[in-house]
C-alpha cells in the first residue's frame, strides 16, 4: 500500500503496533516466568493482560477500516525481543535480583515502543470521523503509561536495592 495519505499511514501504524504488541506479549510471558520478585511477577502478569487488551482493541480498529490486522510485521519490536533474549532469557545471572532488574529494563524498553506507537496513533486519530478510535487508543496509551510507572516504582523500590546488595 502506498503511504500517500494520513489514512494510509494510520492503518500502516495500527498494523505495525498490532504486530509489536503480539511480539511483546510473548516476550512478557517469558519475562514473567523468569522473574522472582513477587511485585514484579504481578506487574508482568498485569502487563500480559494489558497487552492482550491492546491487541484486541487494535484488531477491532484495524478491521473497522477494512484492513488486515496482520498486514505488517514490526521489525523494531523484533529487535527489542531479541534484546530480551540476549540480556535476560539467554543470559547467565549469578543473582535473581540482578536478573529482575534486567527484566524491568527490557520490559520498559518494549513498553516505550508501545508508548510511542499509541501516542502517534492517538494524534493521527484526532481528526474528523475517528473520535471513537482516538478514545480507544487513548485508553491503551493511558494503560501503557500506567504499566511503565508501575515498573519504575518496583525498580526504584525493592528490586534495584536488592540487586546492589
What is each model feature region?
Residues 1-165:
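Amphipathic alpha-helical hairpins
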